[in-house]
């Protein structure tokens, strides 16, 4: 889900200055009006289930170290803080926020805010990867994702088709 289809609150600046973004660029908060800006990505899914929620951002030394990201899912809300000065671990583009259950609902969303941040907050893209239960590793307690397998087909492809239909 690209920033171009997300709902913005406050003034965000479009940029392509730092590489590592998805699609045509990313947004930043111009390091101003802290606490008054947010960007909400509505989760577009064809059916409910478990999803690995991932956020992308071009990292850099002048980025926020405590960017709040709230995942609004079927079981409530979960706030996660990400350090945008560090490179994302997935393909050097995405960082996982965790696995959450979503239903096909208007409420399902991911929101990045500037509340309590210093330096630049970056908003690029969000993707949801469907997760299926497997019988392997179900007894392992070392990983919160034990017994789960991330399916290679990304829900982002479906969302991109939906965006194209809306244009």
Could you say what each language-model-derived stretch is?
Residues 6, 97, 126-128:
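Extracellular beta-strand elements of beta-rich domains used
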Residues 39, 43-61:
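A short beta-strand element within beta-rich, extracytoplasmic domains
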Residues 74-105:
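Extracellular carbohydrate recognition and processing domains
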Residues 1-11, 135-144, 150, 155, ...:
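Extracellular carbohydrate-recognition regions
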Residues 118-128:
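Edge beta-strands of jelly-roll/beta-sandwich modules across compartments, strongly enriched
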Residues 59-79:
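Short, surface-exposed beta-strand/strand-loop-strand elements in extracellular ectodomains
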């Amino acid at each position: 889900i690209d920033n171009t289809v997300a709902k913005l609150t406050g003034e965000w600046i479009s940029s392509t200055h730092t590489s590592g973004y998805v699609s045509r660029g990313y947004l930043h908060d111009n390091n101003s009006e802290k606490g008054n800006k947010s960007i909400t990505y509505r989760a577009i899914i064809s059916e409910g289930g478990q999803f690995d929620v991932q956020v992308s951002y071009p990292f850099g030394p002048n980025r926020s170290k405590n960017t709040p990201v709230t995942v609004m899912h079927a079981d409530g809300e979960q706030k996660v803080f990400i350090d945008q000065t560090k490179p994302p671990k997935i393909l050097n583009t995405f960082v996982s926020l965790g696995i959450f259950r979503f239903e096909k609902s208007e409420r399902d969303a991911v929101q990045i805010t500037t509340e309590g941040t210093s330096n630049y907050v970056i908003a690029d893209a969000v993707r949801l990867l469907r997760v299926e239960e497997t019988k392997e590793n179900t007894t392992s307690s070392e990983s919160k994702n034990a017994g789960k397998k991330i399916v290679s087909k990304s829900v982002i492809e479906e969302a991109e088709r939906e965006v194209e239909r809306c244009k």
